[in-house]
């Protein structure tokens, strides 16, 4: 019996070795290389973000007349604050002169809280706030580095400043007695910025832009509180706004995988 067991064990060991020798050798394959993407600015996008802004306002006090007569020298005041923004646009990227250029059009809307205490006339003080702005325009730029667009922008813009209630600067403080209405100013803007493709999520871009806006002067008629009766005086106001904005944008046609050439 012992001899039979030993014989069977030896036979099993020999058979296993023979079968293993007949099997193909195990092959090892490398993990697939990560896919590289070539970002493209051709297509449309949406985005949102925020920023910080400053505004300067030139105010001149007039007697309405006739004839209309300037009462005071022009004074300059200003405010500052934060804002949120949303944007949508479309771009087109094309090769030229050994690099790539981008042209596009866009529109954006800012939810603002840029405010300051102002004294546009002698003896009166109140708080003024730029509460919103919108812009439509275009941009042109070049792909300075792979995935990096440097651009300039410009176009038309409007900004809304809320109603200002003016009270006496004398002590003790008195309730407001006059005001000038909410006003929308019209103007133009110029800007410059960079936009960078975030490779960890294809289609997602990050951009930062400085923008300067100048608005046409507008006449604000002073009115009494509470009746709103127009007074015989008014204020001409002209505004200049500086903003720095940073946004995340998603491009729907963001590019595709880089295909190796042999």
Task: Write out the residue ranges for each language-model feature.
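Gram-negative outer-membrane beta-barrel domains
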Residues: 2-262
């Amino acid at each position: 019996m012992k001899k039979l067991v030993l014989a069977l064990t030896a036979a099993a060991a020999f058979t296993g070795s023979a079968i293993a020798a007949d099997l193909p050798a195990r092959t090892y394959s490398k993990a697939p290389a990560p896919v590289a993407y070539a970002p493209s600015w051709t297509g449309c996008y949406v985005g949102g973000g925020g920023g910080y802004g400053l505004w300067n306002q030139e105010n001149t006090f007039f007697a309405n007349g006739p004839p209309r007569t300037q009462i005071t020298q022009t004074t300059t005041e200003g405010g500052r604050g934060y804002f949120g923004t949303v944007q949508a646009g479309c771009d087109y990227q094309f090769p030229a002169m050994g690099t790539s250029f981008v042209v596009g059009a866009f529109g954006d809307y800012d939810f603002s809280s840029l405010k300051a205490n102002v004294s546009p006339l002698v003896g009166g003080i109140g708080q003024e706030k730029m509460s919103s702005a919108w812009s439509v325009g275009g941009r042109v730029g070049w792909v300075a580095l792979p995935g990096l667009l440097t651009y300039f922008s410009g176009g038309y813009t409007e900004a809304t400043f809320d109603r200002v209630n003016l009270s006496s600067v004398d002590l003790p403080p008195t309730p407001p007695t006059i005001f000038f209405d909410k006003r929308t100013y019209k103007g133009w803007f110029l800007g410059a910025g960079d936009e960078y493709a975030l490779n960890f999520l294809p289609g997602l871009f990050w951009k930062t832009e400085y923008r300067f806006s100048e608005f046409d002067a507008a006449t604000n008629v002073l009115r009494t509180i509470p009746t709103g009766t127009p007074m015989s005086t008014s204020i001409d106001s002209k505004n200049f706004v500086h903003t720095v904005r940073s946004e995340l944008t998603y491009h729907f046609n963001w590019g595709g995988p880089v295909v190796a050439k042999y």
